[in-house]
């Protein structure tokens, strides 16, 4: 029990660090035909931990940005998957809105236009 309390205090101190990027999401930007088509924003701690590996497995031209959210300009829709968990990830769609909606439904995510 004492170890659990020490761990919780340590985690609270880490989250309250002076680094403004500590809680920032990471992102994986995917481009086709000269423009951004999709971006995956890793919000949860576990999602951030594996974000770079996940991004490397994407097709097409992809770039991983630690501690930098997806671009907001040009977003047609988004899909939040596993909200409020360590695995929370948001897919932002810049083209092919119907495809985005279908992927979101299949993943059981929350779709927003």
Where on the chain are the PLM-derived regions?
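Extracellular/cell-surface secretome signature
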Residues: 22-113
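Sec-dependent bacterial lipoprotein signal peptides
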Residues: 1-12
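Bacterial signal peptide processing site
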Residues: 14-16
């Amino acid at each position: 029990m004492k170890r659990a309390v020490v761990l919780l205090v340590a985690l609270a101190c880490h989250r309250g660090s002076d680094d403004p990027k500590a809680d920032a999401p990471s992102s994986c930007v995917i481009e086709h035909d000269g423009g951004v088509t999709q971006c995956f924003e890793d919000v949860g701690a576990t999602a951030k931990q594996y974000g770079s590996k996940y991004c490397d497995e994407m097709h097409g031209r992809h770039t991983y940005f630690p501690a930098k959210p997806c671009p907001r300009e040009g977003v047609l829709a988004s899909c939040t998957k596993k909200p409020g968990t360590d695995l929370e990830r948001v897919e932002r769609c810049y083209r092919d809105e119907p495809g985005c909606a279908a992927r979101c439904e299949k993943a059981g995510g929350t779709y927003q236009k």
